[in-house]
Amino acid sequence: MKAVDVLISGRVQKVGYRAFTRKNALLLGIKGYVENMPDGKVHAVLEGDDHQIDKLLELLRQGPVVSQVRDIKVTEIERAGHQGFEVR
């Protein structure tokens, strides 16, 4: 099990990116949250199995059809024991 802090930049707000993240996180059994940032980026904290996290990160690099992901920064962090997956 691991936890990562993820910062996604590009055209990622007002394109369904948070809903896309939540849907795929729930399908993969990942806990945490996703939120819009004031600077136009999307921030997520993901907790789960290494393989599941890697799979979700692959999906986040693609994003929903109308998004344009420019960059993803991933930092490993300590797990906080999130319950479920929340859109903030």
Swiss-Prot record:
Top EC group: hydrolase
Family the UniProt entry places it in: Belongs to the acylphosphatase family.
Entry's EC annotation: 3.6.1.7
MF GO annotations: acylphosphatase activity
Active site per UniProt: R18, N36
Organism field: Methanocella arvoryzae (strain DSM 22066 / NBRC 105507 / MRE50)
This protein's UniProt keywords: Hydrolase
Span of domain Acylphosphatase-like: 3-88
PANTHER family: ACYLPHOSPHATASE
Protein name: Acylphosphatase
Catalytic activity reported: an acyl phosphate + H2O = a carboxylate + phosphate + H(+)
